[in-house]
Amino acid sequence: MGTVKCIGILTSGGDAPGMNAAIRAVTRAAIYNGLQVKGIYRGYKGLVTGEIKEFKSQNVSNIIQLGGTILKTARCKEFTTPEGRQLAYDNMKREGIDALVIIGGDGSLTGARIFAQEFDVPCIGLPGTIDNDLYGTDTTIGYDTALNTILDAVDKIRDTATSHERLFFVEVMGRDAGFLALNGAIASGAEAAIIPEFSTEVDQLEEFIKNGFRKSKNSSIVLVAESELTGGAMHYAERVKNEYPQYDVRVTILGHLQRGGSPTAHDRILASRLGAAAIDAIMEDQRNVMIGIEHDEIVYVPFSKAIKNDKPVKRDLVNVLKELSI
């Protein structure tokens, strides 16, 4: 196990349902293996400012069902500077922390990679993001819960869209990845998904919608990823309104609703497995890897691979949506 006797845990970047389940798993697995645990508040900001507290098993009782993160999360400009990272390292050493477990997305893992390279600190990452955009893992903590939140919202929007015979553009999160939009569309029976991985022109949408109305579909729902590459739901809605004023068009932006809520059973189990595996990795002297899951097996993915590679959307899912929305 080397010289690791105390680990620090932090959550960074956008919050995701299941982060608390991961905090619980890391804490209890560490204690089970004889390690001391320190909770670092507000992500890398807490490492810079010294907001650090010892965690016992009872500190993580009754949190597995909670959304958000008890450790809080924040952006930290100071950590992007060498001076800020030096402060973070000094605080880490003062607290006796030998290794870090970072729960977050690609920005969080990028920060961990830089920190590890500069100070030779063992860092283990857990994929915590609703976007599901990290390479090397089939799914990320929070993605399943966000997908179910989208499904619940679209089911309700479908009721009013049908009643008023309207075309709804529903914008979902995902940044530059279309996993939420595409799989949300398949799960909800939406007519189309606009995602950054594949271009969609207004005339393609219009022909698709026309076909639906010819087949007695009196309403349609299109899910749009929030990416700058797509322009978002408002962009498409305005273009359709201008070019095809015969359609009654509405826009719903789900926004931060997707980040909240109690995590699903899938996310709780995933977070628990990944959290326990993070401690296994530390005990094995692993460093600077993300813990992922592929084909239901735990994998160690180097930070460089997880961060630099784009996670592809499966073309067969695009085809499934196209075939089922006729």
Swiss-Prot record:
<feature type="binding site">
    <location>
        <begin position="24"/>
        <end position="28"/>
    </location>
    <ligand>
        <name>ADP</name>
    </ligand>
</feature>
<keyword id="KW-0021">Allosteric enzyme</keyword>
<feature type="binding site" description="in other chain">
    <location>
        <begin position="256"/>
        <end position="259"/>
    </location>
    <ligand>
        <name>substrate</name>
    </ligand>
</feature>
<feature type="binding site">
    <location>
        <position position="166"/>
    </location>
    <ligand>
        <name>substrate</name>
    </ligand>
</feature>
<dbReference type="GO" id="GO:0030388">
    <property type="term" value="P:fructose 1,6-bisphosphate metabolic process"/>
</dbReference>
<feature type="active site" description="Proton acceptor">
    <location>
        <position position="131"/>
    </location>
</feature>
<keyword id="KW-0547">Nucleotide-binding</keyword>
<feature type="binding site">
    <location>
        <begin position="75"/>
        <end position="76"/>
    </location>
    <ligand>
        <name>ATP</name>
    </ligand>
</feature>
<keyword id="KW-0418">Kinase</keyword>
<keyword id="KW-0324">Glycolysis</keyword>
<feature type="binding site">
    <location>
        <position position="14"/>
    </location>
    <ligand>
        <name>ATP</name>
    </ligand>
</feature>
<dbReference type="InterPro" id="IPR015912">
    <property type="entry name" value="Phosphofructokinase_CS"/>
</dbReference>
<comment type="pathway">
    <text>Carbohydrate degradation; glycolysis; D-glyceraldehyde 3-phosphate and glycerone phosphate from D-glucose: step 3/4.</text>
</comment>
<dbReference type="GO" id="GO:0070095">
    <property type="term" value="F:fructose-6-phosphate binding"/>
</dbReference>
<dbReference type="InterPro" id="IPR012003">
    <property type="entry name" value="ATP_PFK_prok-type"/>
</dbReference>
<feature type="binding site" description="in other chain">
    <location>
        <begin position="189"/>
        <end position="191"/>
    </location>
    <ligand>
        <name>ADP</name>
    </ligand>
</feature>
<feature type="binding site">
    <location>
        <begin position="105"/>
        <end position="108"/>
    </location>
    <ligand>
        <name>ATP</name>
    </ligand>
</feature>
<keyword id="KW-0460">Magnesium</keyword>
<dbReference type="GO" id="GO:0005524">
    <property type="term" value="F:ATP binding"/>
</dbReference>
<keyword id="KW-0808">Transferase</keyword>
<comment type="function">
    <text>Catalyzes the phosphorylation of D-fructose 6-phosphate to fructose 1,6-bisphosphate by ATP, the first committing step of glycolysis.</text>
</comment>
<keyword id="KW-0067">ATP-binding</keyword>
<dbReference type="GO" id="GO:0046872">
    <property type="term" value="F:metal ion binding"/>
</dbReference>
<dbReference type="InterPro" id="IPR022953">
    <property type="entry name" value="ATP_PFK"/>
</dbReference>
<dbReference type="InterPro" id="IPR000023">
    <property type="entry name" value="Phosphofructokinase_dom"/>
</dbReference>
<dbReference type="GO" id="GO:0005945">
    <property type="term" value="C:6-phosphofructokinase complex"/>
</dbReference>
<protein>
    <recommendedName>
        <fullName>ATP-dependent 6-phosphofructokinase 2</fullName>
        <ecNumber>2.7.1.11</ecNumber>
    </recommendedName>
</protein>
<feature type="binding site" description="in other chain">
    <location>
        <begin position="173"/>
        <end position="175"/>
    </location>
    <ligand>
        <name>substrate</name>
    </ligand>
</feature>
<feature type="binding site">
    <location>
        <position position="250"/>
    </location>
    <ligand>
        <name>substrate</name>
    </ligand>
</feature>
<dbReference type="GO" id="GO:0061621">
    <property type="term" value="P:canonical glycolysis"/>
</dbReference>
<keyword id="KW-0963">Cytoplasm</keyword>
<dbReference type="Pfam" id="PF00365">
    <property type="entry name" value="PFK"/>
</dbReference>
<feature type="binding site" description="in other chain">
    <location>
        <position position="215"/>
    </location>
    <ligand>
        <name>ADP</name>
    </ligand>
</feature>
<feature type="binding site" description="in other chain">
    <location>
        <position position="158"/>
    </location>
    <ligand>
        <name>ADP</name>
    </ligand>
</feature>
<feature type="binding site" description="in other chain">
    <location>
        <begin position="217"/>
        <end position="219"/>
    </location>
    <ligand>
        <name>ADP</name>
    </ligand>
</feature>
<comment type="subunit">
    <text>Homotetramer.</text>
</comment>
<feature type="binding site" description="in other chain">
    <location>
        <position position="226"/>
    </location>
    <ligand>
        <name>substrate</name>
    </ligand>
</feature>
<dbReference type="GO" id="GO:0006002">
    <property type="term" value="P:fructose 6-phosphate metabolic process"/>
</dbReference>
<feature type="binding site" description="in other chain">
    <location>
        <begin position="129"/>
        <end position="131"/>
    </location>
    <ligand>
        <name>substrate</name>
    </ligand>
</feature>
<dbReference type="InterPro" id="IPR012828">
    <property type="entry name" value="PFKA_ATP_prok"/>
</dbReference>
<comment type="similarity">
    <text>Belongs to the phosphofructokinase type A (PFKA) family. ATP-dependent PFK group I subfamily. Prokaryotic clade 'B1' sub-subfamily.</text>
</comment>
<feature type="binding site">
    <location>
        <position position="106"/>
    </location>
    <ligand>
        <name>Mg(2+)</name>
    </ligand>
</feature>
